[in-house]
């Protein structure tokens, strides 16, 4: 069996992985001005960097919003498109080794996919994600560079901008510890520092995603949430999601290659869809 290439094609960023003998090899990401340039650039670079010949590639599996722009096989290699939500679930399950979970795909917005064995269902989403973080940062901090915003946030203090339970109550409320957020940005002042604003923006996005994922699990017995997508790489995830775990009695997991899970899932879909 040759190499199966999984490609997650975004509007400007493409993520690509290879799958051979059940193992993920050398994931990379490429950013370009448009999805076609990004896709072909990523594919060419992947083959070049890993010394892979065209005849070693058995199949290319595409997913993501940018895949709609692709109308033919990639460089003459057999190419198939697969559903993005299915790819999210397959990749998250493969990397986390968790069979029953809500897959939280944190992209420009955020989608929720229930994965229970081979039963995969898209159960909803919210318009909060990386696009929100970039847009608010552009307005409030004059930058949309997520790495820069994250670095600023590491120097900030969320207590300077967010209202906590301890600010409005002399004792914890039922199920709510003193450090739980009562209102996001409710304490922000006109002279709030860039660092505190950055901390507030990131906390708002991650807390909202975390709380929404818990609501998505309401009425089910699912207590595991697998976080995938670029935002899962933010160092603030390691601070915010453990607090939400205690608050809601759930478990958040960030697997290896969390940024590439959708591309991995696309490659895995080759066998699931009976193409092999």
Language-model segments: which ranges?
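Short glycine-rich, Thr/Ser-proximal phosphate-binding strand/loop in the N-terminal lobe
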Residues: 3-41, 120
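Short beta-strand-loop/turn "lid" adjacent to the catalytic site in phosphate-handling enzymes
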Residues: 29-32, 43, 48-84, 94-95, ...
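Glycine-rich phosphate-binding loops at beta-strand->alpha-helix junctions
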Residues: 62-68, 215-244, 259
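Conserved phosphate-binding catalytic cores of ATP/NTP-utilizing and phosphoryl-transfer enzymes
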Residues: 70, 75-104, 109-119, 264-272
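Conserved phosphate-binding/catalytic loops in two-lobed NTP-binding clefts
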Residues: 78-85, 242-264
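Glycine-rich phosphate-binding/hydrolytic loop that grips phosphoryl groups
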Residues: 90-95, 133-137, 252-276
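Glycine-rich phosphate-binding loop plus the immediately following alpha-helix
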Residues: 118-173
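Adenine-nucleotide phosphate-binding core of ATP-dependent small-molecule kinases
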Residues: 174-224, 259
């Amino acid at each position: 069996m040759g190499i199966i290439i999984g490609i997650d094609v975004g509007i400007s960023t493409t993520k690509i992985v290879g799958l051979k003998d059940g193992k993920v090899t050398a994931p990379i990401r490429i950013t370009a001005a448009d999805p076609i340039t990004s896709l072909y650039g990523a594919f060419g670079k992947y083959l070049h960097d890993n010394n892979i010949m065209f005849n070693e590639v058995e199949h290319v599996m595409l997913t993501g919003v940018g895949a709609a722009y692709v109308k033919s096989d990639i460089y003459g290699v057999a190419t198939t498109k697969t559903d993005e939500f299915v790819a999210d679930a397959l990749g998250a399950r493969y990397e986390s080794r968790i069979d029953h979970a809500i897959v939280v795909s944190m992209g420009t917005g955020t989608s929720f996919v229930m994965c229970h064995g081979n039963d995969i269902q898209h159960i909803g989403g919210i318009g909060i994600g990386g696009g929100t973080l970039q847009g608010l940062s552009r307005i409030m901090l004059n930058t949309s560079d997520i790495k820069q915003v994250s670095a600023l946030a590491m120097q900030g203090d969320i207590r300077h901008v967010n209202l906590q339970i301890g600010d409005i109550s002399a004792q914890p409320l039922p199920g709510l510890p003193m450090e739980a957020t009562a209102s996001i940005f409710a304490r922000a002042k006109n002279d709030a520092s860039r660092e505190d604003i950055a901390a507030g923006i990131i906390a708002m996005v991650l807390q909202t995603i975390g709380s929404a994922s818990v609501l998505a699990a309401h009425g089910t017995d699912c207590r595991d949430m697998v976080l995938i997508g670029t935002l899962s790489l933010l160092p603030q995830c390691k601070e915010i999601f453990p607090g939400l775990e205690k608050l809601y009695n759930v478990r958040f997991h960030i697997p290896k290659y969390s940024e590439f899970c959708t591309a991995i899932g696309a490659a895995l879909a080759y066998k699931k869809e009976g193409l092999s």
